[in-house]
Every structure is written in C-alpha cells, then in structure tokens.
A protein has these predicted regions:
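N-terminal/edge-of-domain interface segments
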Residues: 1-221
C-alpha cells in the first residue's frame, strides 16, 4: 500500500459520471457498470467506410465494427455485464494515459475490463480510498493479434478479420480480452487511475461488490 501524495478528497467528484447497478437476485453479486464516454480518446473500431480512422496500434489497425456490439449497448461477457461506450468520431475506447475514473464511494471486490493491447501490456492501475491511501494493482492484457491469454484472461470478443487503413484482412482474427483485477483492501474506494501505457486500450469497465461485503454494509437481507 502506498501513501497518496495528494489526498483523495482532491480527486474529481462522482457527480455526473453515469453508472448502472445490475443485480439479478439478493443472493448474487452486484455489478456497477461505469460509464467512460467522457474519457474516450482513441479509435480502435472501424467500418468499411472509415478504415483509415483506426488507431489501435502504430500501423493503424482496428477491430471490425460489424463483429462488435453497437455503441451504447448493454452486453454480457462470461456472466459479467458491461455498458458498451457510446462511440463518437474521436473515440470508442480509452487509450491509457493515467486517466482518473471517479466511482461511487463503496467497497468493491473486483474490477473487470474489456480491453486490448498492442502486443502484451502489464502495468499498474491505482485504486484510491477514502482513508487517504491508494493501492497499486497489477493489470495485464494480452496481445490483441496473437490471441494467447498470457495473463489468464478470457476472450471477450474474437473477430474473424482485422482492419488495415486501406483494406480488410479476412482470416486474420483479433481478440478483445476480459481482464479481472482484484481489490483486496476492505475500504471504500473513491476512484481508479488507469495505467500510463498507450499500448493498453479500455473499452468498458465494471466493478463487482461481493455478497459478503453488501451484507456487512447492511444492504441485503
């Protein structure tokens, strides 16, 4: 655990960030789907008409939009619900540059990411807490092109082709990964800081609060 140089109270307030709570039954975990539309800064999904806008890597490759969810959709991957970002001309994902994601203050067990990486990336994601401390959490995302889960992730979406700036390469699959990061501290988290790694791209974020934590907080019967 590392002492914050700046107290979490100076972080952005949670007011205004769209979040959505999903719980199937009182005995199941609660998921918090975090909106990241305001942080979108990179194009990594293109259609046949805008191939040249892709910026997933240095060569301008991108995922085919036809094989991924439409903007704004609620999707489920391996039982985890996600809010797919509302893409615009400037971005459909967050290229990680140390952005802060403010979240409703609460106790969380896991961070789930739909993410992709140029080659494989392993870096630090920070969780900020209301006691003035932050925890460094390791996150690893495997290569979107290789398709091998180096860090134990699950494939979130696999496509049958990859887009280049001037053509579509059929038969060259790509992978967007479902990554999981544990939050072991029993404290109330206020915000997350994404890694400083421009090779890492985040498309959706969901947080999980365990049933044992919710009972301790008096939020379940």
């Amino acid at each position: 655990m590392s002492q914050l140089s700046t107290h979490p109270a100076s972080l952005p307030a949670t007011a205004g960030r769209p979040v959505r709570s999903v719980r199937a039954t009182t005995s199941s975990p609660e998921f918090l789907l975090v909106g990241i539309d305001d942080l979108l800064n990179n194009r990594a999904i293109t259609g046949a008409a805008d191939l040249g806008d892709g910026r997933l890597n240095a060569w301008g490759n991108s995922f085919p939009a036809e094989e991924l969810p439409a903007p704004g959709m609620l999707v489920e991957v391996a039982g985890i619900p996600f809010q797919w970002a509302n893409a615009h001309t400037e971005g459909d994902n967050v290229r990680c540059e140390g952005q802060i994601i403010d979240i409703p203050p609460a106790r969380y067990d896991w961070i789930y990411l739909l993410a992709a990486s140029e080659r494989r990336s392993e870096d630090t994601l920070w969780a900020y807490y209301d006691d003035g401390y932050a925890d460094p959490l390791r996150v690893g995302v495997s290569d979107f092109l290789d398709g091998t889960p180096v860090f134990g992730e699950l494939p979130g979406f696999r496509t049958t082709r990859m887009h280049y700036p001037h053509h579509v390469q059929h038969g060259l699959p790509t992978t967007m990964w479902l990554s999981r990061v544990g939050m072991p501290r029993h404290g109330r988290a206020l915000a997350l800081r994404l890694p400083r790694s421009v090779a890492l791209h985040v498309f959706a974020v969901t947080l999980l609060t365990g049933i044992d934590v919710r009972r301790a907080d008096g939020t379940t019967a």
